[in-house]
Regions:
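Eukaryotic protein kinase
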Residues: 7-8, 43, 73
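Regulatory hinge/linker segments at domain boundaries
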Residues: 1-22
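Residue cluster at the C-terminal edge of the helix-turn-helix DNA-binding motif
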Residues: 18, 22, 30, 52-57, ...
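Hydrophobic transmembrane alpha-helix bundles
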Residues: 35-37, 71-74
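Short alpha-helical segment immediately N-terminal to, or the first helix within
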Residues: 20-25, 36
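Recognition helix of helix-turn-helix DNA-binding domains
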Residues: 28-61
């Protein structure tokens, strides 16, 4: 089980890891988009990918998974 759990850690792209870190810091999609100079739709797509790849129910759950697995630090 642990191997399968950690196998997903490397599935996130560098851009998705950056967005996940910003989510964990409390940023909304609009704020993330402005800081990264991308569209809000791009961020929404990345958030959707993050949730799917991590098996998270929502943004907060994704941040908790990311922190627990060591994908991100804040």
């Amino acid at each position: 089980m642990q191997l399968a759990e950690h196998a997903t850690d490397h599935v996130l792209t560098p851009a998705e890891v950056r967005v996940l870190r910003m989510i964990a810091e409390g940023n909304a999609n609009k704020e993330i988009a402005a800081q990264l100079s991308v569209s809000e739709d791009t961020v929404k797509g990345q958030v959707g990918n993050i949730l799917s790849k991590l098996g998270a129910n929502d943004r907060t759950h994704a941040a908790r998974i990311g922190l627990k697995r060591g994908i991100i630090e804040i």
